[in-house]
Swiss-Prot record:
Catalytic activity from the UniProt record: L-histidine = D-histidine
Function description: Cofactor-independent isomerase that catalyzes the reversible conversion of L-histidine to D-histidine. May play a role in growth of F.nucleatum.
Subunit architecture: Homodimer.
Keywords, alphabetical: Isomerase
Organism listed in the record: Fusobacterium nucleatum subsp. nucleatum (strain ATCC 23726 / VPI 4351)
Enzyme class: isomerase
EC number, as in UniProt: 5.1.1.24
Protein name (database record): Histidine racemase
Loss of function: phenotype: Knockout of the gene results in a small but reproducible lag in growth compared to wild-type strain during exponential phase. Depletion of metal ions from the media results in the growth curve of the wild type organism approaching that of the deletion mutant.
């Protein structure tokens, strides 16, 4: 960064509370993306939980990770810009961290900037229960992110920060782009998602997390035989649905604003 001001085209989107900025008309493989993203996410800038860079039908996340909510947001933006969109349409997109094409079913939701977006999520690579110290966690690995499920009711009381530190240590010898920890309360089907992006060397508590809800859904299917549930997130809801061995995540998306951002 040489002191010049960069002007970027942005779209601010709210997928179930997980505020996402998409940057358009920019080199999606620019080496400064992590730095730019950190700046954009600040409270004094556009204030968001994550940033993605879009070109045609591809979404490149700030740390090269996969993100379900950003993918739902991107498909909803395509619908918002699509002159032929009326009530419902399917959009096929790709996202960093995932080699498969992603299919997203976008429907209207009461206003021209509001949608419901249902995405077919990637299959997990592995699903297991592990012990870290004396805590039991689910571990669901995807190609773009690994998610840990921490069942609050089935573990002894501890601080979330302690679990985050233990997970970082557990992964210290692994090459990964991002990990999540879903702090899950089975009594009221709610969760508090935490996501750490290695490239940025920082993590945040998100207001909702689609890939984390997917991981939780696979975990609940295997260990609790629950193949559909609306999971309450800190600032909204996401529903996972398992049909014919495929996992779908459905929920609201709102296009909030678009314009220029100065970095």
């Amino acid at each position: 960064m040489d002191g010049k001001v960069q002007v970027l085209d942005f779209i601010k989107i709210n997928p179930a509370g997980n505020i996402t900025i998409l940057i358009d008309n920019f080199d999606i493989y620019d080496k400064n993306i992590p730095k730019l993203s950190e700046e954009i996410m600040k409270e004094t800038n556009l204030y968001a939980e994550q940033v993605g860079f879009i070109k045609e039908k591809h979404l490149q996340m700030m740390g090269g990770e996969f993100c379900g909510n950003a993918s739902r947001s991107f498909a909803s933006l395509l619908a918002f810009r699509d002159k032929d969109f009326s009530e419902q349409k399917n959009y096929s997109i790709t996202c960093s961290g995932e080699s498969e094409v992603l299919d997203v079913d976008v429907r209207t939701d009461g206003a021209k900037n509001k949608f419901l977006a249902k995405i077919k999520m990637p299959k997990f690579i592995s699903l297991e229960e592990i012990s870290i110290d004396e805590y039991k966690l689910g571990l669901v690995r995807f190609s773009g992110i690994s998610h840990f499920i921490f069942n609050i009711k089935e573990n002894k009381e501890t601080s979330f920060e302690n679990i985050i530190d233990l997970v970082k240590k557990y992964l210290s010898n692994e090459d990964y782009s991002a990990f999540g920890i879903m702090f899950f309360d089975k009594d009221n089907l709610s969760m508090k998602p935490y996501v750490y992006v290695k490239e940025l060397e920082s993590g945040i508590y998100e207001n909702s997390c689609a890939s984390g809800t997917t991981a939780l859904g696979y975990y609940l299917k295997k260990y609790k035989n629950l193949d559909r549930a609306k999971v309450v997130q800190p600032n909204g809801w996401l529903e996972y649905i398992i049909e014919n061995d495929e996992m779908y995540i459905d929920g609201p998306v709102e296009i909030v604003a678009e314009g220029k951002v100065y970095i």
